């Protein structure tokens, strides 16, 4: 594949790599789906009123969700630290996350997965991904030589941090 074909393939996969599957989820009410759709299209976390509205509909604890969102940057920073400690070779010259632009893309992806997790937690919907979007992400990662083991470690770290938060804060189901 030449560079023009490669760029076209990457561009097509980026367009397909929409991972949020909550926009049409039948167990989420229409108002909550609309709020999630808007936030997802704008690639942002939920705002306070959106959190409160979605949590009221789903019966989840808006304070726990708001706290998790307020800590998002810290969680991504801890993922960076974990990955840099456990897989330092990825950041060295010749590593899959070198130069800095490549590692910054990894952190953006972590933030986006965390963003999706916040929507899922607020709506109390664990099945939150779009299968075709996830498949496109996998293809994109393969095409761009994203280190799968590194991304897996980063996402596992994120999951552990959020799980720890949920166990140490009031239950997300408490109102």
Can you name each region flagged by the protein language model?
Residues 1-80:
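Charge-rich, low-complexity N-terminal segments
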Residues 45-155:
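Heme-based O2/NO sensor domains and their adjacent alpha-helical segments
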Residues 156-160, 165-166:
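Well-ordered alpha/beta subsegment
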Residues 167-174:
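Conserved small/polar residues in nucleotide/adenosyl-binding loops
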């Amino acid at each position: 594949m030449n560079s023009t074909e490669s760029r076209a393939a990457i561009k097509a996969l980026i367009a397909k790599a929409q991972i949020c599957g909550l926009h049409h989820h039948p167990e989420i009410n229409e108002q909550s789906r609309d709020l999630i759709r808007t936030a997802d299209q704008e690639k942002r976390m939920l705002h306070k009123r959106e959190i409160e509205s979605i949590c009221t509909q789903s019966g989840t604890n808006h304070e726990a969700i708001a706290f998790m969102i307020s800590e998002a940057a810290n969680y991504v920073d801890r993922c960076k630290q974990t990955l840099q400690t456990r897989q330092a070779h990825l950041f060295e010259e010749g590593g899959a996350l070198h130069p800095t632009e490549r590692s910054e893309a990894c952190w953006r992806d972590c933030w986006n997965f965390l963003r999706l997790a916040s929507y899922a937690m607020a709506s109390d919907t664990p099945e939150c991904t779009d299968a075709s979007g996830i498949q496109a992400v996998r293809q994109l990662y393969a095409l761009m030589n994203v280190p799968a083991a590194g991304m897996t470690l980063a996402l596992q770290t994120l999951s552990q941090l959020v799980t720890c938060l949920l166990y140490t804060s009031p239950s997300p189901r408490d109102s």
